[in-house]
Amino acid sequence: MEIRGILFKRLFLSFGQRAFVTSTVPTTKLFINGKFVESSASKWIDVHNPATNEVVTRVPICPKEEMEEAVASAKAAFKSWSNTSILTRQQTMFHYQSLIKKNMKRLAESITEEQGKTLVDAEGDVFRGLQVVEHACSVTSLQLGESLPSIAQNMDIHSYRIPLGVCAGVTPFNFPAMIPLWMFPLALVCGNTFVLKPSERDPGASMILMELLKEAGVPDGVVNVIHGQHEAVTFICEHPDIKAISFVGSDQAGKYIYERGSKNGKRVQSNMGAKNHGVVMPDANKEHTLNQVSRDQFLTTGLWMKITQVE
């Protein structure tokens, strides 16, 4: 009886702990007007740690009202941000670059926990995104216009690069830091505002990047984050206040976004699924070649544009 009592107690504690953990799983917030906001969503997606299957966070399927609020916030912020000195925007990117470097390990750990790639690969994910932020710091040369004097009598031509307005980005799950960093830093430094929809499967890195962006001094509303699936993508493609969309991901989603967005008069860049070619030369080391090709099939579960796909 005593042994059974002990076993029962252990089982009870075990089930009790599991129930407690389940009820206290953190939720992924929205980022609207410079604040991390709890969603009022009725539908949520569980994000699992691929190594342990533990639920690490719950991601909301945002209702339309919250997505509208994010776009309205970006639109309101555009008025002042687009008129901010280009040197001020550049200094903000310098500060942001420094903060990402300091928090690289934290970002990598979040990626590994949610997405599953190794810490080394996760740090590479952050580093490649950081390089784009560094490029954004050269905005003073990126924003140069053009001039052509004397094209006719008493006539010169000058062209200027001006911000578009509210831009949006839809990013995939395989590079949770790198691909968002391909998008919003360049949009911001050129005077645009931004609405980001990260992958609902691993949004943690994007939320940390928002925290660092706020610390870098970017004004409230300049960048906003929403969460969701197909409905959120359609919302971005159809909202009249969103002027441009950047997408990286699968062929099916990319074609949908390109067709739907351009039909509504938006500038769309759609980087769809791709793979590298592999050419095996006659003098190649066969063992090394097989190891490399086999390795590619498992990196990021095979979903990486750089790898060679075997069919």
Spans of features found by a protein language model:
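ALDH superfamily catalytic-core signature
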Residues: 252-311
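Active-site pre-lysine segment of PLP-dependent enzymes
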Residues: 206-215, 230-241, 252-263, 279-287
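Conserved small-residue-rich beta-alpha loop and adjacent elements
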Residues: 146-220
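Short beta->alpha connector loops at strand-helix junctions that form conserved
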Residues: 192, 197-199, 227, 248, ...
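A structured beta-alpha segment of the ubiquitous adenosine-cofactor-binding alpha/beta core
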Residues: 156-157, 224-246
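Glycine-rich loop-to-alpha-helix module at the N-terminal edge of alpha/beta enzyme cores
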Residues: 54-144, 154
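Residue-level signal for inorganic ion chemistry
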Residues: 53, 89, 111, 133, ...
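Terminal low-complexity tails and localization/encapsulation signals of metabolic enzymes
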Residues: 2-58, 91, 95, 145-171, ...
